[in-house]
């Protein structure tokens, strides 16, 4: 889609939800994961989209797919890149470069239950955004990133620590 098409689409959705705020709340498509073999998992949704993960060989996996942790970082990088592109189009900024890199630091002792004082997930997350735009000032480009960090759904879920509700169904 062109910037103009994105701009028009976003404007239309914003107008619709402004006029119909009760329609903005929806249940997100669930992801269902099953073990394929060993530690290789297959996640699907109702549209039959498939996503695979696996663990490194050193921990008993087959190393046939990215780890779930990498998929989390990829989700954040993709979400931030999408939000930057949407906001740029909305503001009439044509991006010439956009690259979002997400890294993290983890301590595997948490994952492996070696030390209960160490978190199983990332200890921190770093985001590097490289961007350039036609006739856009450095301040405008920085504002795109600042805005995105306030509105990225994946970034929000990670930084806000969304409550989890776990149910178990024994079959």
Residue ranges and their predicted role:
Residues 75-80:
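Alpha-helical metal-binding/catalytic segments enriched in His/Glu/Asp
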Residues 1-74, 86-171:
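Extended beta-strand/beta-hairpin segments
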């Amino acid at each position: 889609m062109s910037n103009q098409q994105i701009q028009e689409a976003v404007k239309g959705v914003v107008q619709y939800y402004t006029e119909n705020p009760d329609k903005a709340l929806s249940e997100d498509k669930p992801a269902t994961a099953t073990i394929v073999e060993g530690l290789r998992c297959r996640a699907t949704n109702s549209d039959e989209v498939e996503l695979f993960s696996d663990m490194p060989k050193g921990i008993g996996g087959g190393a046939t797919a990215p780890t779930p942790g990498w998929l989390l970082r990829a989700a954040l990088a993709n979400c931030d890149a999408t939000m930057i592109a949407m906001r740029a189009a909305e503001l009439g900024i044509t991006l010439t470069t956009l690259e979002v890199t997400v890294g993290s630091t983890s301590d595997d002792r948490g994952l492996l239950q070696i030390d209960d004082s160490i978190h199983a997930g990332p200890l921190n997350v770093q985001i590097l955004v490289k961007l350039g735009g036609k006739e856009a000032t450095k301040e405008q480009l920085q504002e795109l990133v600042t805005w995105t960090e306030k509105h990225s759904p994946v970034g929000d879920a990670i930084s806000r620590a969304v409550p989890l509700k776990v149910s178990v169904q024994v079959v």
